[in-house]
């Protein structure tokens, strides 16, 4: 039996409300951008299949609500995640300060060896930037995780962010995980899909 992909990776986008998680997802999955901002209610997800080192990788990317009242809903989505992208807004110091809290959430709910990536979004707003690139890079280095500044609006580094994450997960899983490794995840990941629409009203 030959599946249409070699790997299935579940990724999460987390971070404060308004940092641009949904815009990053839209840019990567659909190559679109919208100025109209609507808060994600609970959880949304999109799928995109990529090629990496001759392998087909299906990325299932979950966009979680940043608001406090949805924390209990979204905590269950940490389970089974292979990679988590922590997003802050380079023009919002508070969203950067809260990265530490989001990392604590990962430690609390996600599997121990989950891959992490720190992303500073809205890099196109250069005149409003308050979080220094060097500061964020040093912080990410101290944690041993990759760091990128992105702009969903200009599509800067968006592709690179998701590709970096996919490459890191693939490297961690090793060649042995390719053919059979994703099948148990299919069972785990197929159940929340039904809840995504109705469970958050």
UniProtKB/Swiss-Prot annotation:
Matching Pfam families: Ras
Listed cofactors: Mg(2+)
Gene3D superfamilies, per database record: P-loop containing nucleotide triphosphate hydrolases (3.40.50.300)
Residue positions, PTM Cysteine methyl ester: 201
Gene Ontology terms: cellular component: endomembrane system; perinuclear region of cytoplasm; phagophore assembly site membrane
Activity regulation remarks: Regulated by guanine nucleotide exchange factors (GEFs) which promote the exchange of bound GDP for free GTP. Regulated by GTPase activating proteins (GAPs) including TBC1D20 which increases the GTP hydrolysis activity. Inhibited by GDP dissociation inhibitors (GDIs).
Key word Lipoprotein present: yes
Membrane topology: Lipid-anchor
Keyword RNA-binding on entry: no
Residues engaged in binding GTP: 17-23, 33-36, 39-40, 66, 121-122, 124, 151-153
N-acetylmethionine found at: 1
Lipidation (S-geranylgeranyl cysteine): 200-201
UniProt family annotation: Belongs to the small GTPase superfamily. Rab family.
Domain remark from Swiss-Prot or TrEMBL: Switch 1, switch 2 and the interswitch regions are characteristic of Rab GTPases and mediate the interactions with Rab downstream effectors. The switch regions undergo conformational changes upon nucleotide binding which drives interaction with specific sets of effector proteins, with most effectors only binding to GTP-bound Rab.
Function, in words: The small GTPases Rab are key regulators of intracellular membrane trafficking, from the formation of transport vesicles to their fusion with membranes. Rabs cycle between an inactive GDP-bound form and an active GTP-bound form that is able to recruit to membranes different set of downstream effectors directly responsible for vesicle formation, movement, tethering and fusion. Plays a role in the initial events of the autophagic vacuole development which take place at specialized regions of the endoplasmic reticulum.
The protein's name in its UniProt record: Ras-related protein Rab-1B
Organism of this sequence: Bos taurus (Bovine)
């Amino acid at each position: 039996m030959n599946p249409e992909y070699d790997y299935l990776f579940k990724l999460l986008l987390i971070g404060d409300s308004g940092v641009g998680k949904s815009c990053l997802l839209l840019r990567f999955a659909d190559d679109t951008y919208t100025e109209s901002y609507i808060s994600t209610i609970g959880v949304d997800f999109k799928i995109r299949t990529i090629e990496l080192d001759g392998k087909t990788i299906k990325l299932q990317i979950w966009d979680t609500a940043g608001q406090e009242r949805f924390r209990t809903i979204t905590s269950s989505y940490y389970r089974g995640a292979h990679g988590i992208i922590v997003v802050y807004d380079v023009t919002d110091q508070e969203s950067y300060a809260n990265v530490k809290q989001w990392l604590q959430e990962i430690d609390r709910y996600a599997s121990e060896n989950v891959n992490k990536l720190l992303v500073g979004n809205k890099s196109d707003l250069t005149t409003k930037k308050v979080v220094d690139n060097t500061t964020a890079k040093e912080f990410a280095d101290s944690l041993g995780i990759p760091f990128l500044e992105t702009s969903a609006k200009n599509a800067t580094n968006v592709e690179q962010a998701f590709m970096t994450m996919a490459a890191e997960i693939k490297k961690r899983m090793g060649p042995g995980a390719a053919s059979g490794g994703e099948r148990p995840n299919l069972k785990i990941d197929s159940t929340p899909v039904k809840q995504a629409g109705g469970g958050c009203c």
